C-alpha cells in the first residue's frame, strides 16, 4: 500500500470520529495510547488496535517494562483497600453500638438502664425511724433465762458413744499419779553449806559467803542463790563464775546487791580462840546479794537414761570485787558442784 494513502486513511478516520455522534460508554472506557511513528503525526490509537498491530523490536522490548509499571501501580492502589485490624474494627463496632444506644436482646431497654436499676444504695437505721444502737444491760444477780425450746432440744440429745469414751479417758487421767512423783533427773547440790556461826566466820575471813542455793524443777533449768558480803565504801560488784564443761569454758553472771539489806555482823564471843581485840566490838555491816544461773536444756538427761552415768556437773564460785581487792568463795577451794540425780523428793 502507498504510504500517502495510509496517511490519508488515518486522517479520514480521525475526522469522522470527531464530526460523528458521541461515542458510547464502552467506547470511551477503552484506553488510548499515544503512538508516535517516524514520518507521521501524533494520533491517539485505541489499545485494542495496538494489540492487533505487529510491534517493532524497540516497542517489544519496552512493553514488559510498561506492564511491570502498571502492575506496581495496581498493587499500590489495592493496598489502600485492605481490611483494617480486626481488633480496631471490633472497637469501632462497640463504640458505634454504645453511641447508638441499641436495646438489649432480652428486655428491649438500653444497656445503661440496667446499671442504674441495679445500683447499690446505703440506708441507715435512723432514716427509717429506728435506733442506731441496741443496749442490753446484764446484772450479776440476774440469772440468764434460757428459752424452753433450747432446753428441750438439749435434753432430747442423749450422750453418744464417743462422748462416753472421752469421759472414760478423762476419768483415767484424773486417777493417774501426780507427775511430780514420777522419778526424773533433778539437779542436786554435792556440797554442804556452812551453818550460821561457820558462815559468819567465813564471811569475816573472805568477805563473801554463799548462804542459800535452790534448783528449779524440770523442765526448767535454773539455779538461784543468795549470800552476803561485807560492805565497804566505793564501788563494789559481785559475780558468779560457773561452768558445765569442767572449766574448759566458763561464764560470769553478775549478781544483784541489795543495799537496803545492810545489817551489822554479830561480834565474836570472847571465848573464841584467835580473836582480836577489835573483833569483840560490833562487826562491820553486811549486804545481801542474789543471783540466777540459766543452764542449757541439753544438760538434762533424756528419759530412760541413767543420770549417774550422764556425768554432767555444774561447778560455780562467787567473786566479790571492791576497792580493798578481789575475794572468792569457792567452797574452800573445792568449788560448789551440782549434779543430776534421779529422785522424787523436792529440794
Curated annotation (Swiss-Prot):
UniProt key word Cell membrane: no
Domain CBM21 intervals: 200-339
Pfam families named in the record: CBM_21
GO CC aspect terms: cytoplasm; protein phosphatase type 1 complex
GO biological process per UniProt: glucose homeostasis; glycogen biosynthetic process; positive regulation of glycogen biosynthetic process
Highest taxon listed in the record's lineage: Eukaryota
Chain residue ranges for the region called Disordered: 1-77, 258-286
Record keywords, A-Z: Phosphoprotein
Polar residues composition bias: residue spans: 13-22
Induction: Up-regulated during fasting and down-regulated after feeding.
Residues bearing PTM Phosphoserine: 81
GO molecular function: glycogen binding; protein phosphatase binding
Function according to Swiss-Prot or TrEMBL: Glycogen-targeting subunit for protein phosphatase 1 (PP1). Involved in the regulation of hepatic glycogenesis in a manner coupled to the fasting-feeding cycle and distinct from other glycogen-targeting subunits.
Protein name, entry field: Protein phosphatase 1 regulatory subunit 3G
Upper taxonomic lineage: Eukaryota, Metazoa, Chordata, Craniata, Vertebrata
